[in-house]
Amino acid sequence: MSDNKQKKEVLKKAIGKIEKTFGKGSIMFLGEENAVQNIETISSGSVAIDIASGVGGYPRGRIVEIYGPESSGKTTIALHAIASAQKNGGIAAFVDAEHALDPVYAKNLGVDVENLLIAQPDYGEQALEIVDELVRSNAVDLVVIDSVAALVPRAEIEGSMGDVQVGLQARLMSQALRKLAGNINKSKAVVIFINQTRMKIGVMYGNPETTTGGVALKFYSTMRLEVRSIGKITEGKESIGNQVRIKFVKNKVAPPFKEAIVDVIYGKGIVRENELFNLAVDEGLISRRGSWFSYVDSTGTEHSLGQGKNNSLDYLLNHPELLDEIEEKIREKHGLLKKGEKSEEESLE
């Protein structure tokens, strides 16, 4: 017993030393409930993703990688983060290396396209220099790079089609991230790199998938989000969207491996009322009796939302104060109330 106590004391000192050297959150128990730290974040624009992140969104001063197969919803998730940053008075920039941003779709997701900074660089070095300048200005809250695969080094663009350019992009990313990481940390901006997956040739065992641009981004990222479409959303016989799973395969500021499942509707993205309804049902805030749904608000009044999900969503859309209350309750339950906000119980006191 005394041996055990002694071990705990030694471990406590070791953890204290590690945190002093490498910062708070560099080591923690995986099952810690209070692993949520007082970290400044930018909301992802999705309550489910904020919960899975463990800290209420993407941490400021850090690099985040969002990766997955084609058409899995990576850019949609990044655009929701931009809309969220702008909604809270922040300035966002989109480095469109793929030259594929759809302003109409971005606007549908809530992005203020009139005030969104956009760059369409000709080659990788130019894109990363633009990111560095924006970050060092200390005036930008969020920068999204879409995508790493499109950050083609200048030497490759200026060379001939048949030239063999081994490891150029990986070297470019490694060099750029060494410089960027410190500047990002000082500026308190969030930099999101969107990345694509590729299949490794000749892999017999393990996961044959890998991401482009070498391994530097994996190391420098505080969070790595794997985005995958896991099913279609249908209305009658018509497909209206995809069910998407977001897995935090790396998280330096909270326990990793948490998942969020969101509905991404074509042309609309992650619809707030739909997401809150699904979460409220899962959390037991909205009760279900057969096909009827009901909700008891903070005053104790029971609201019969309607029969079926669509009627219930219509009711909530006509009563936006209930949607706000549901979101607050969900965030409070997961310890994600923003700084300065109080829970309903604290407000009553």
UniProtKB/Swiss-Prot annotation:
Keywords linked to the UniProt accession: ATP-binding, Cytoplasm, DNA damage, DNA recombination, DNA repair, DNA-binding, Nucleotide-binding, SOS response
GO-annotated biological processes: DNA recombination; DNA repair; SOS response
Pfam families (alphabetical): RecA (PF00154), RecA_C (PF21096)
SMART domains on file: AAA (SM00382)
GO molecular function: ATP binding; ATP hydrolysis activity; ATP-dependent DNA damage sensor activity; damaged DNA binding; single-stranded DNA binding
Compartments, as annotated in UniProt: Cytoplasm
Primary location: cytoplasm
Statement: the UniProt record of this protein carries the keyword Iron: no
Gene3D superfamilies: P-loop containing nucleotide triphosphate hydrolases (3.40.50.300)
Signal sequence, renumbered to the chain: none
Transmembrane segments: none
Domain of life of the source: Bacteria
InterPro entries assigned: AAA+_ATPase, DNA_recomb/repair_RecA, DNA_recomb/repair_RecA_CS, P-loop_NTPase, RecA-like_C, RecA-like_N, RecA_ATP-bd, RecA_C_sf
GO CC entries: cytosol
Residues where ATP binds: G68, P69, E70, S71, S72, G73, K74, T75
Known role: Can catalyze the hydrolysis of ATP in the presence of single-stranded DNA, the ATP-dependent uptake of single-stranded DNA by duplex DNA, and the ATP-dependent hybridization of homologous single-stranded DNAs. It interacts with LexA causing its activation and leading to its autocatalytic cleavage.
Record family assignment: Belongs to the RecA family.
Protein name: Protein RecA
Originating species: Thermosipho melanesiensis (strain DSM 12029 / CIP 104789 / BI429)
